[in-house]
Amino acid sequence: MGKTKTRGRRHQDKQRKDEFEPSSNSAKEHIQQEESTYNDEAEIKETQPQMFFGVLDREELEYFKQAESTLQLDAFEAPEEKFQFVTSIIEEAKGKELKLVTSQITSKLMERVILECDETQLKDIFQSFNGVFFGLSCHKYASHVLETLFVRSAALVERELLTPSFDNNEKEGPYVTMENMFLFMLNELKPHLKTMMNHQYASHVLRLLILILSSKTLPNSTKANSTLRSKKSKIARKMIDIKDNDDFNKVYQTPESFKSELRDIITTLYKGFTNGAESRSDISQSTITKFREYSVDKVASPVIQLIIQVEGIFDRDRSFWRLVFNTADEKDPKEESFLEYLLSDPVGSHFLENVIGSARLKYVERLYRLYMKDRIVKLAKRDTTGAFVVRALLEHLKEKDVKQILDAVVPELSMLLNSNMDFGTAIINASNKQGGYLRDDVIAQLIQKYYPEKSDAKNILESCLLLSASTLGNTRDDWPTAEERRRSVFLEQLIDYDDKFLNITIDSMLALPEERLIQMCYHGVFSHVVEHVLQTTRVDIIKRKMLLNILSKESVNLACNVYGSHIMDKLWEFTAKLTLYKERIARALVLETEKVKNSIYGRQVWKNWKLELYVRKMWDWKKLIKEQEFEIFPNSKPLQPKPEKHSRERNNSKEGSAFKKQKHYR
């Protein structure tokens, strides 16, 4: 008898009871209910700190606006002049620091000043915020100033740690280390940690503090994948042209006290979320559900991801991981419902993708085995959610499990690429990592998608880069789009993956009208694809000649272009053993010497092509070419003597001509 489907009202009620559906306000309500865990004083004042410190008068505002413009222009003749100017700003700002950092206009000035000031001035600014760090971290503009301040402070902590006599450089007065000042600030923030975790601005500050305390890389504040700032903040920072100094994008050594503080912060948060439970068995299901709601909250989720990443430094039990997920070998209905939500929600899938990368392998294997193994293809088809989790599994599971995933997913790859091109990269990397597992099948699927044999109009530049719908050839000076960058990088990965894609790409380029290919050379993104196919040892000599026939006609204009000049640099090597083409390009550049040398890009091409040597000592230039050819093709055979038959014929003809000459003279 077949398995009957369970039905009935009781079963439906049980399903509804186990179903995970976060309430949009539940996390915030949870904060308000449990804020008293940290501080028994008025809760409203804590969650909404008083942040008005007055306003600058008109003259002060005008001075600081002008100072900000001057720093932005950065037209100082010497570093000393710039430092004196920064010092004068700091002197003028004394007593007004809080007004400055809470203003949209002048907060940018404070960031610039913090980036340029010396260590003593940095400490003075840091101390001016004592008592209001929490309030500033919750402020839209001041929170950015704090982030910049904390990164520079972390660099100073390391410097003091590694330089025992550092205090000799300090001015008169009591010496306070940056470490002690940092610890004092952390004590001020501890009563508000839970509020900060779910606060729009303070959550970024908290994440940065965790990175500093755990000695992780402090990322660049403008990079797209930076964990330091929100997407809007990174865009705004680029627009106002605030550049990070050398203290960013580094890992800093920290004192032991920082590790203790990290343990204290994470332990405090854990006790707050579990109501001080002594063991996991004392934690109620409702508490676990509420914390899971935090895990899928778009503000709190990145903080929890980071906590799970660093908690292993001192907590072997991985308490936060075990608060989110079970560790038993059996399925749990509530956990299953939660996993299903994670795999179908954008925030949830991003959370799961990140924690998989930092969790113990046995925990990841458990989740995969219980909840994902039997439906991996279905998850891969969820291009905005589950596909990211599958990619993370391919990176972190053991060889056996990765091969199982590849067995299931590779036959569907050409279809999956329709909506998720990055998935192709993950498959290629996983296949390579497993010694080229299913390599031929992967290549076949990729060719089926981008260069189908049965198609008469096949062109990988159209199918992969979507040239017809791109910004190529636009006269409006449109910036290349992020989608175009993503597609170009993927095609470059395919070119590196196998020679078939290199040859397919070259064939597609040669199939384009010449004008279209030249337009690609001047495009901010597609020029990289042209540059990438110019691989001397991988491209056969016939195709090299066909490409050079087109590119050499445009050599002067390419040399004077920001993107085309890189292609010209590659042609220096690409013309190896094709001396005729190399000389043709060199001659064209020399004929337009003035135009080339008047261009900053042209001068670099002139240098890389050794054209001064070409003009002054042609034979030395040709000798250099021969050396280059031998370096690129060390195993190439020298010119062979002609066969013996031809040699005899030549000798006979010589003897015959000599006999005729002798007869003539007689």
From Swiss-Prot:
Gene3D superfamilies, sorted: Leucine-rich Repeat Variant
Annotated stretches, region: Disordered: 1-40, 635-666
InterPro entries: ARM-like (IPR011989), ARM-type_fold (IPR016024), NOP9 (IPR040000), Pumilio_RNA-bd_rpt (IPR001313)
Regions of compositional bias (Basic residues) in chain numbering: 1-14
Ranges where the PUM-HD domain occurs: 23-435
GO biological process: endonucleolytic cleavage in 5'-ETS of tricistronic rRNA transcript (SSU-rRNA, 5.8S rRNA, LSU-rRNA); endonucleolytic cleavage in ITS1 to separate SSU-rRNA from 5.8S rRNA and LSU-rRNA from tricistronic rRNA transcript (SSU-rRNA, 5.8S rRNA, LSU-rRNA); endonucleolytic cleavage to generate mature 5'-end of SSU-rRNA from (SSU-rRNA, 5.8S rRNA, LSU-rRNA); maturation of SSU-rRNA; ribosomal small subunit export from nucleus
Keyword Repeat: yes
Keywords annotated in UniProt: Nucleus, Repeat, Ribosome biogenesis, rRNA processing
Pumilio repeat segments: 92-127, 128-163, 188-223, 286-326, 334-368, 369-407, 511-548, 549-587
Cystine pairs: none
Location(s), subcellular: Nucleus, Nucleolus
GO MF entry, a single one: mRNA binding
SMART domains: Pumilio
SUPFAM superfamilies linked: ARM repeat
Segments of skewed composition (Basic and acidic residues): 642-653
N-terminal signal peptide: none
Entry GO CC: 90S preribosome; nucleolus; nucleus; preribosome, small subunit precursor; small-subunit processome
Keyword field contains Nucleus: yes
Family: Belongs to the NOP9 family.
Role according to the record: RNA-binding nucleolar protein required for pre-rRNA processing. Component of the 90S pre-ribosome involved in production of 18S rRNA and assembly of small ribosomal subunit. Component of the pre-40S ribosome required for release from the nucleolus.
Summary of subunit composition and partner proteins: Component of the 90S pre-ribosome. Component of the pre-40S ribosome.
Any further remark recorded for this protein: Present with 2930 molecules/cell in log phase SD medium.
Protein name according to UniProt: Nucleolar protein 9
Taxon lineage: Eukaryota, Fungi, Dikarya, Ascomycota, Saccharomycotina
